[in-house]
């Protein structure tokens, strides 16, 4: 390796491209490894950097949406990829959609022309001793995964995610739902779960819809998901299987699985429900709850309808939809600092989906922070930890402090931000505007000295 390169970046996806650019802009010489086109992932189609392999939408660009706030922060911090996306944007209402080929071309051109970035088109299977950013993405190669396992242990590297939908607490109808833990007999403890009870008839409607709901087609290398896989923490997600697959095993399969009612009594009726959907607290603030055992591959429109069939969630606000797919990611709560620095090796950083963030823009954001901090480390400057009041800071804090029992990839949403203390109660849109204003003010104060 050329010793004039001070920083190695592994992966030329969204996070790696942004990280390389940010470090180079700080005066650091960067060696960027990308194995395509000589090594393929099974999902990518081209050799371009920052290829979008799923949707061509980067989510809402409205200033009072979580994704819009994240983009506003990236603009303030000089994101290359966001600038490229806006250059080739397409009409998409309030969303930022792009011409995917032109987007990747612009990013590739910018990286190739940067005087301090060298691209090396080959697979890297050993983690270098030099200052390094690992941004190898959800389809990290087998060879690099082996090196990661040797470094962090097999229990801290996952190959599938099993994401259950998350709803906001404020949208749960507690006159229908109730708090309880199974077999609870005390009087003081109100229970750790919110339970949505179903009658026999309600379950029949729910089951029939689930049985006929349309699922996302799996890629060839994701076929194992149909039979259950280890996804996320092995202690909690061994043998994860989509809820729609369980339903196809028989009408009562769910009643002996995630919807089992045993040990629960509905205080509104004094009887045991026929079926129960349990919601588990997902963040320390208690503003988000996930649907226990509801990992799914159903299309988003189908998920929305089926969640609205659950008593107590008729008006449920879904802040994250469920999914199960091939996704290499590390157990960040035990391994990373919010600066994206590896705890056990000061000159190693991670960025992108491998850290446990979800979505294009979140990947760009963590890549940006990793690139800045790797450069700051090399320049003997203090690392930048963004405040939790910013969306980037909140995401980085969440993935590095999440509760182990519920650790799964997370996207930008208002539920991970600290609550705003105000004199009067705000409606949903007013609260979103307040979050956006606070984010802008806090971020400006944090980066003005950079």
Q: Whereabouts are the PLM-identified features?
A:
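N-terminal FAD cofactor-binding segment of flavoenzymes
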Residues: 21-83, 388-399
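A conserved beta-strand/loop capping segment in the N-terminal third of enzymes
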Residues: 61-108, 112
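Predominantly flavin-linked oxidoreductase catalytic cores and closely associated redox partners
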Residues: 110-305
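A glycine-rich dinucleotide-binding beta-alpha-beta segment and adjacent secondary-structure elements
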Residues: 291-357, 364-366, 384-402, 409-411, ...
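An active-site-proximal "capping" alpha-helix that borders the catalytic cofactor pocket
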Residues: 362-377
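Beta1/beta-strand and adjacent pyrophosphate-binding region of the FAD-binding site
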Residues: 3-15
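Glycine- and aromatic-enriched mobile tails/lids
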Residues: 37, 354, 373-450
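Conserved active-site and cofactor/substrate-binding residues in soluble primary-metabolism enzymes
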Residues: 14, 18, 44, 65, ...
């Amino acid at each position: 390796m050329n010793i004039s390169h001070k920083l190695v970046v592994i992966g030329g996806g969204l996070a790696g491209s942004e990280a390389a650019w940010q470090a180079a802009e700080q005066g650091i010489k960067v060696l960027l490894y990308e194995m395509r086109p000589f090594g393929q992932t099974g999902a990518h189609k081209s050799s371009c950097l920052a290829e979008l392999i799923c949707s061509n939408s980067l989510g809402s660009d409205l200033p009072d949406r979580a994704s819009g706030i994240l983009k506003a922060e990236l603009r303030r911090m000089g994101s290359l990829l966001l600038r490229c996306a806006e250059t080739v944007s397409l009409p998409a209402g309030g969303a930022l959609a792009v011409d995917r080929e032109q987007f990747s071309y612009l990013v590739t051109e910018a990286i190739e022309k940067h005087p301090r970035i060298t691209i090396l088109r080959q697979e890297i299977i050993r983690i270098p001793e030099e200052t390094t950013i690992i941004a190898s993405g959800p389809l990290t190669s087998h060879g690099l995964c082996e090196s990661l396992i040797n470094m962090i242990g097999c229990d801290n590297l996952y190959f599938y995610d099993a994401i259950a939908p998350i709803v906001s607490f404020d949208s749960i109808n507690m006159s229908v739902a109730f708090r309880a833990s199974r077999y609870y007999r005390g009087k003081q403890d109100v229970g750790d779960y919110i339970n949505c009870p179903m009658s026999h008839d309600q379950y029949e409607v729910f089951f029939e819809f689930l049985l006929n709901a349309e699922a996302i087609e799996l890629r060839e290398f994701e076929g194992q998901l149909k039979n259950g896989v280890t996804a996320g923490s092995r202690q909690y997600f061994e043998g994860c299987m989509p809820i729609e697959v369980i339903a196809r095993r028989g009408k009562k399969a769910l009643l002996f699985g995630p919807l089992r009612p045993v040990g629960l009594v509905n205080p509104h009726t004094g009887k045991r429900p026929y079926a129960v959907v349990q919601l588990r607290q997902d963040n320390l603030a208690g503003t988000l709850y996930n649907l226990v055992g509801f990992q799914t591959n159903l299309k988003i429109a189908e998920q929305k309808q089926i969640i609205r069939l659950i008593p107590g969630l008729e008006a449920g606000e879904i802040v994250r939809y469920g999914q199960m797919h091939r996704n290499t990611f590390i157990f960040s709560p035990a391994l990373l600092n919010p600066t994206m620095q590896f705890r056990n090796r000061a000159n190693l950083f991670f960025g992108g989906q491998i850290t446990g963030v979800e979505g294009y823009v979140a990947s760009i954001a963590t890549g940006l922070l990793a690139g800045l901090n790797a450069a700051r480390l090399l320049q003997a400057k203090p690392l930048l930890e963004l405040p939790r009041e910013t969306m980037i800071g909140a995401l980085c804090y969440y993935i590095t402090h999440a509760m182990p029992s519920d650790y799964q990839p997370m996207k930008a949403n208002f539920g991970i931000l600290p609550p705003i203390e105000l004199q009067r109660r705000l409606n949903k849109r007013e609260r979103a505007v307040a979050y956006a204003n606070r984010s802008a003010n806090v971020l400006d104060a944090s980066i003005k000295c950079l």
